[in-house]
Amino acid sequence: MITTQSISDIRKQVTAWRLKGETVAFVPTMGNLHLGHITLVKEAKTRADHVVASIFVNPMQFGQNEDLDAYPRTLADDQAALIEAGAELLFTPTPDIIYPKGMDAQTFVEVPSISDELCGASRPGHFRGVATIVCKLFNIVQPDIAVFGQKDFQQLLVIRTMVEDLSMPIEIVGIETIRETSGLAMSSRNGYLTTEQKDQASQIKRTLNNMALSLKAGLLIKDVVAKAQAELVHVGFRNDYLDVRNANTFAIATAADKDLVILVAAYMGSTRLIDNLVVKLAY
């Protein structure tokens, strides 16, 4: 696997593959890779001739009081994992390479409406940072396919919308959330949890499952949400949001909707965890 910080090196290699009529899949990450990331790379390998990955801890998507400096940097381990998974090219730019004029002078991409709700409301500017870096990386790599995890459901929808609105010729593939044996969604931030907190955090998935059963049984959405919020508080969470949306439009769900997604963000100690569950009701 070739590792480079150079935009021109990335473009030269991708161009060489293109001249042979070969396809390229892309998996952008912030590093500190776990099995969820590796699953994305392996899936990408089945969908294209070549896989490009990136590792960039994007300062634009972190808020003032968030953990940018504390975010783990584990490049050597990440490289070994990517090689084993089948990636052939790794882009590891620095902030100076991505934002040479500084972030305040950087042209940005913002997807309206979706970016301002839930995680966007809790983390103002977060999705502008996500959309901007993903747009830049897409322009640098120019992949045929890009693979993302569904754990970040709202982020995936933001990226799909950006690609559609800007007429980017890229297929966006979402992969089902990879979980630990306890049911806890795999996340780089799980490393911040103590053993006891990880055990408590596994309640998120059980709560989502209980909500799905209640919704399928025809209970009112507001009652299902209220009960679930209480469950999470009982095991030690501080709720950020818990909501049920239309899985296709992201509008607040109504009794008439059949394709739903339950989305949750909650704090265990100082660590913010997110998860979701898609629920299909009978027509």
Curated annotation (Swiss-Prot):
(R)-pantoate binds at Q61, Q155. GO terms for cellular component: cytosol. ATP binds at residues 30-37, 149-152, 178, 186-189. Disulfide bonds: none annotated. It is an enzyme of class 6 (ligase). It comes from the Bacteria. HAMAP family: PanC. Homodimer. This is Pantothenate synthetase. The lineage of its organism: Bacteria, Pseudomonadati, Pseudomonadota, Gammaproteobacteria, Alteromonadales. The gene is panC.
